[in-house]
Amino acid sequence: MLSPIILFLSIIIDRIFGELPEKIHPTVWIGNIISFFEKILKSTHSKNKYKDFIFGTLTTISVLFIVFGAIYGVEILINNIQNIYIKYIVYSFLISTTIGYKSLLQFSKTPLNHIKNKDIESAKKSVQCIVSRNTDKLDTKHILSASIESASENITDSIIAPLFYAIFFGLEGAFIYRAINTMDAMLGYRNKKYEYYGKLPAILDDIANFIPSRISGILLVLFAPLYGGNIKKALNGFIKEGHKTPSPNSGYTMAVMANSLNMTLEKIGYYKLGNGEITLKKAYNSLFSIDVVIFSFIVLYSIYYVIFYYF
């Protein structure tokens, strides 16, 4: 299992420095690999759903094979480093490239800051960068809702899930998860072009996020008072509303957040979670919950690690 020191350093590195430039960012490279295979197989797309599924499966397997091979080779090189401190730093840096702590906070906070400054049009434009819905006609409460929904969902996708797989499967685990998540983001759409071509990435993403999403939700419940929430209401949201979103995973963190802070999160025509007025203060509190979840995750894992190895 991964040392808690590496986990902590990874978080600190990402929190301070944020995302790497696109030219040297591993996730961008993974995206380029996905685009390469999609371009090769694009001409083979047809109205035959079975063919589309087969070609999508070939793309998925190819991408995962390349990512695993590359990271396995990198890990061999890292293991040849004699200095343990340098080895820890390199390992931590690489894992930090699979998470998006700083960027998640920045993108989620921007719409809130615009609303605070009463600049609704800029808030609509900034929230459009983090959600797939049309934001042109959203009012203030639905802009706040969209920001919080995105932030709570991405606690899992951007942070907890890659760390979870790094803990149990090392660098390969973190990067394979990131590859699956990136393929789902690029190919996992329910439209004519991607319905079957992106089917496998979507299924794998649901499977990969099943445990991490529930860990994130449980941490939001347990430590609700630290971000101004209510444990009892948070637990009620987890149990009764976590399953109400189209995604089998994203609803748990959103439902906990909504109920814990006594507010309503709504994607019109899809779901409505919680019951209460959504305010700017509650929105900022929801972003603080990201810090709470991350550091509670690290602390609890550190305790488990010490008990497992030393007792």
From Swiss-Prot:
The chain crosses the membrane at residues 53-73, 76-96, 157-177, 288-308. GO terms for molecular function: ABC-type vitamin B12 transporter activity; threonine-phosphate decarboxylase activity. Pathway: Cofactor biosynthesis; adenosylcobalamin biosynthesis. One of its GO terms (cellular component) is plasma membrane. The keyword Manganese does not apply. One of its GO terms (biological process) is cobalamin biosynthetic process. It is found in: Cell membrane. The keyword Disulfide bond does not apply. Keywords: Cell membrane, Cobalamin biosynthesis, Membrane, Transmembrane, Transmembrane helix. It is a multi-pass membrane protein. HAMAP family: CobD_CbiB. Belongs to the CobD/CbiB family. NCBIfam families: cobal_cbiB (TIGR00380), PRK01209.2-5 (NF002281). Converts cobyric acid to cobinamide by the addition of aminopropanol on the F carboxylic group. This is Probable cobalamin biosynthesis protein CobD. It comes from Methanococcus aeolicus (strain ATCC BAA-1280 / DSM 17508 / OCM 812 / Nankai-3).
